[in-house]
């Protein structure tokens, strides 16, 4: 494995996460390599399937770099899927066109849950190979983000056997058999920490934990079944590699209510969805963590002038930068597959241009 990667030319994103001064507000987009890009759709057709794309380091590298060839983004994010982890745990991941991910062997009874173990990371070598290959081919243009799902979010898919509207099965287990739920979450936490560390060893320069379904939990249950295990993960994730800081981001969609508690989880930055007021969030936790977000992805269906106006609102909501403040611009969730690619050009240019006066 090459230990010598090209020197980083643009570290704005990493500095913002560490609340160091930057010349402008950096940005990247959740799902920036995705179906809204015609070049992504062409590569996916060649790969034959989503898993054919994600499990092949050459294809994964190609699609990771596509948005960077088109837009002046400040970070790349590994092209993969959070469900590679339960797949490695033996649950049998497959995709049905139009229905999304499914598991052949969901965790529905005590026997299945008790059999769950931290997997051999060798079964995820294709992910680590992709990380190293992407980092090499980036040639230092921008940093590379590695990522994982949170223990709770992974558990939702593992128990439900796929996506869900109401999380009935996983919540029934949580309330009826909390002992089984905790066993799943503890196993997931150990796995996820090792998985992120292996991505860091392979070349990831920052890591992010997506708690997509944390917001489905009641207050109280969130702290016990999601937040606690994210804290467990953060305790074990490397904060540096070869003397260089590796910043971390956590993101609970629908987690605005628990902002102060999320900020204390041990990550350098907290991602926000579009329901949160960024300025209010900064007032609450901005001395402690950087913030990432939080434009409504649907704004990208508006006219260019409207996109610029909404970008300005988000930037002004965060306000002028001071010592120890950090903001990474992003959407409040993943970009829609129906987004016109040219809208992203407007967004990127607007963020870079309109944020500069706020950093003086």
UniProtKB/Swiss-Prot annotation:
Picking any one GO biological process from the record gives: protoporphyrinogen IX biosynthetic process from glutamate
UniProt site positions, description: Transition state stabilizer: 81
Record-level Gene Ontology MF annotations? uroporphyrinogen decarboxylase activity
Establish whether keyword Cytoplasm is in the entry. yes
Which residues are noted in the entry as substrate-binding?
31-35, 81, 157, 212, 333
**Xref: SUPFAM superfamilies:** UROD/MetE-like
Q: Which pathway, metabolic or otherwise, does it act in?
A: Porphyrin-containing compound metabolism; protoporphyrin-IX biosynthesis; coproporphyrinogen-III from 5-aminolevulinate: step 4/4
Query: What is catalysed by this protein?
Result: uroporphyrinogen III + 4 H(+) = coproporphyrinogen III + 4 CO2
Family annotation (PROSITE patterns): UROD_1, UROD_2
Keywords recorded for this protein, A-Z: Cytoplasm, Decarboxylase, Lyase, Porphyrin biosynthesis
Which family is this protein grouped under? Belongs to the uroporphyrinogen decarboxylase family.
What is the annotated role of this protein in its UniProt record? Catalyzes the decarboxylation of four acetate groups of uroporphyrinogen-III to yield coproporphyrinogen-III.
* Name of this protein: Uroporphyrinogen decarboxylase
> Which species is listed as the source?
Janthinobacterium sp. (strain Marseille)
